[in-house]
A protein has these predicted regions:
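Short, low-complexity Pro/Thr/Gly
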Residues: 1-402
């Protein structure tokens, strides 16, 4: 039989391979979930701290660390409001309060991770936005509507009604659905994976390393929306679920020999959230030196109301408005990306913004894949305006992956 090409090599179909067996995994003997309780009291606004001791021979599976909370929303009437005079009412029985989307993560504005007392997570005060944007762009509709994201109280807001409270004439249906979970003072349980760089890589953490986590609370005015009351979230119980793996003695000895000569390597994809204030009344703004040093793989830009960002009970913090933007250009090392600036039109009469919308796919590496993010073309202009740019694809001509 002649070959298709002289450089083509011969192969064997797996259907004809009768004499080999699949390999057997022996390096990990077993694993189990361990629950850790916080070492601090669960005060209203106090940070929550966890410590995972590094003693023993078990390794930690960092990708499977999860936070579990049980909370209750307590509501009081605004001074001079229409309340009945009671000082505290279980959430939602007399006053209507709505939790914002992705509540488990919206409750925190910063998460610090320490390995042996050394900070390994970049400091920032916008963790809620990082978690929201990653979930919004990296998961398709099934994960958001019927799978694990609902465990974090993810319920995608209705476009065009992002700020419409439950007691509005036309309320946001997603707010209504989320409000049912805390109606009449019902306790709500939440669980989910934490969006931290060290938890987004596959390597186990070796033994002998103490892990300390510090979770800083967001303002209640940031994660609760309401009109005639002031509510607060009270954390009833908190647990950190950690998967510990028992490693075979041979692997432990081999690792110990290598660690006597060198250090363990943990390559990370670092995610940073940077915030800038654009003053009201300006028709144009140029922001220089946004990133100094190492070039980012990907940049995602969104615009929110400053009051919502800082916590306003009547505004949705995740309402990424278009603000009438008609020109957007990004420069990296003096090179414009893309070569022609984005010039969308968000006019009601003649909306033209498909190139900006398409960046949600080209900028996240899924534009040629059978994947999505549940943001339709119509939804985009009504609270989901994000501009995404894949710099690796531009400079190297290859995708940087998701």
């Amino acid at each position: 039989m002649s070959f298709l090409h002289t450089h083509s090599s011969e192969c064997l179909k797996s259907e004809l391979d009768f004499f080999s067996l699949p390999p057997t995994q022996t390096s990990i003997e077993s694993s189990q979930w361990i629950y850790y309780k916080p070492i601090t009291s669960l005060g209203d606004d106090a940070p929550i701290e966890f410590v995972i001791p590094g003693h023993g021979e078990d390794y930690l599976d960092l990708t499977h660390i999860m936070l579990s909370l049980r909370i209750r929303v307590e509501t009081s009437p605004l001074a001079g409001g229409d309340g009945d005079g009671e000082t505290s009412t279980p959430g939602g029985s007399a006053f209507k309060v709505d939790p914002v989307n992705h509540l488990l993560h919206s409750m925190f504005n910063q998460i610090d991770v320490y390995f042996n007392q050394k900070l390994v997570s970049p400091p920032n005060n916008a963790y809620a936005y990082r978690a929201y944007i990653e979930a919004l762009l990296n998961y398709s509709s099934p994960a958001k509507t019927s799978h694990h994201l609902t465990s974090c109280l993810w319920d995608m807001d209705t476009p065009g009604l992002m700020d419409a409270l439950v007691d509005s004439e036309t309320p946001n249906p997603a707010l209504v659905r989320r409000a049912r979970y805390i109606h009449e003072g019902h306790a709500l349980d939440l669980i989910g994976h934490l969006y931290c760089d060290v938890f987004n890589q596959d390597k186990f953490l070796i033994n002998g390393v103490e892990v300390r986590m510090r979770l800083v609370r967001s303002k209640d005015s940031f994660c609760l929306m309401e009109n005639t009351s002031t509510s607060k979230i009270r954390i009833l119980d908190a647990s950190l679920l950690v998967k510990r793996a028992k490693i075979s003695p041979g692997i432990l000895l081999a690792h110990a020999r290598m660690l006597s000569k060198t250090t363990a390597k943990y390559p990370l994809t670092r995610v940073e959230v940077k915030t800038f204030t654009i003053h009201a009344g300006l028709v144009g703004e140029s922001i220089d030196n946004v990133i100094l040093g190492q070039l980012s793989k990907r940049i995602i830009v969104g615009f929110v109301d400053n009051r919502a960002f800082n916590g306003d009970r009547k505004l949705n913090p995740f309402n990424f408005k278009n603000y009438g933007i008609n020109f957007f250009s990004l420069y990296a090392d003096g090179i414009q990306i893309p070569s022609r600036p984005l010039q969308p039109s968000f006019s009601r009469d003649e909306p033209l913004y498909v190139e900006a919308y398409h960046t949600l796919f080209s900028g996240t590496g899924i534009h040629f894949l059978n994947e999505g993010n549940s943001i339709s073309r119509e939804y985009y202009a009504e609270g989901f305006i994000l501009f995404a740019f894949d710099l690796i694809a531009f400079f190297l001509g290859c995708t940087s992956g998701r």
